[in-house]
A protein has these predicted regions:
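C-terminal structural segment of proteins
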Residues: 1-286
Length: 286
């Protein structure tokens, strides 16, 4: 069937709007479709072969506005840092799930775009006994398993972010850096006590994630600075965590409110409580 053990048919058709027969026949039809294994190795090898040895740089001049525009593709985190120092107002783009809408809906025309998909240092996931560290360029689909191991509610939250195509493109770092008040990940990460690492040139700084959001549309990031990674502490056995997303539709919809609660118990006594919310103000907060 078109659904598999790792990807149920319900996930495949997530966001489908049915206005006639109901979802039962759609699910039945999906489960009845035979699926044979597909080898994409040759296609992937061909696409990887198109990658250039040197970073692809495109410069153009807009004669109507007199503006020079740049497309830059660093291959290392050092190149990225240098490019952002040289172009401090550049937009960093990973999956483009937000910036694409800014261009098509708001008619935004950034002077410089820096694509980070080939920066290996931003595409790492590190786990140890105490922390999970996710690079800013890691896509939701790639982070899903590690987040689900951290706590099942985190895995379920990620599964409800957009559709599969969005999760295959969008990144957790982008969800944080863009500062949307209805971003799904920040409330959960704030409740868990996550910390953010930022970089400007060769300088790093770390802050609690909740301090990154100042007010609507404004984050604690100077021009030329970028999000490098987010560190999520591993919950201890005495913690209880619950994460809930409310939206008009279950799948592929923005949050009306996203709530995350982390309680630390000492026996039957709550010693610490962290409650974080998104969608209720100009920034996610606790």
């Amino acid at each position: 069937a078109c659904g598999t053990k790792d990807q149920p048919v319900g996930d495949v058709i997530a966001g489908n709007l049915c206005r006639c027969t109901g979802y039962g026949p759609i699910l039945d039809a999906g489960n009845a479709v035979p699926v044979s294994a597909r080898d994409d190795g040759d296609t992937i090898a061909l696409l990887q072969g198109l990658r250039r040895e040197q970073p692809l740089t495109i410069h153009s001049h807009d004669p109507e506005t007199g503006v020079d525009r740049h497309w830059l593709t660093p291959r290392s985190i050092e190149q990225l840092a240098d490019m952002l120092v040289a172009h401090p107002t550049a937009r960093v783009i990973a999956g483009g799930t937000d910036i694409g809408l800014w261009v098509t809906k708001k008619l935004d025309r950034p002077e410089a775009l820096i694509w980070i998909g080939d920066v290996a240092e931003l595409n790492t996931i590190r786990e140890d006994r105490n922390n999970l560290v996710i690079g800013a360029g890691v896509r939701y689909s790639d982070a899903h398993a590690a987040l689900a191991r951290l706590h099942p509610d985190l895995g379920e939250l990620v599964r409800r972010i957009g559709g599969l195509q969005v999760r295959n493109a969008g990144t957790i770092g982008g969800n944080i850096a863009n500062g949307s008040p209805i971003g799904d990940m920040p409330p959960a990460l704030i409740a868990l006590g996550a910390e953010l690492t930022l970089r400007h040139g060769d300088r790093h700084r770390t802050m609690p994630l909740e301090d990154f959001f100042i007010t609507y549309g404004r984050q604690d990031r100077v021009p030329g600075e970028f999000v490098e990674s987010v560190r999520i502490p591993r919950p201890d056995p005495n913690s209880r965590i619950a994460i809930t997303k409310l939206s008009k539709r279950f799948d592929s919809d923005i949050s009306a409110v996203c709530a995350a609660i982390a309680l630390h118990f000492d026996g039957d006594v709550v010693r610490d409580a962290r409650l974080a919310f998104g969608g209720m103000a100009g920034i996610p907060a606790r």
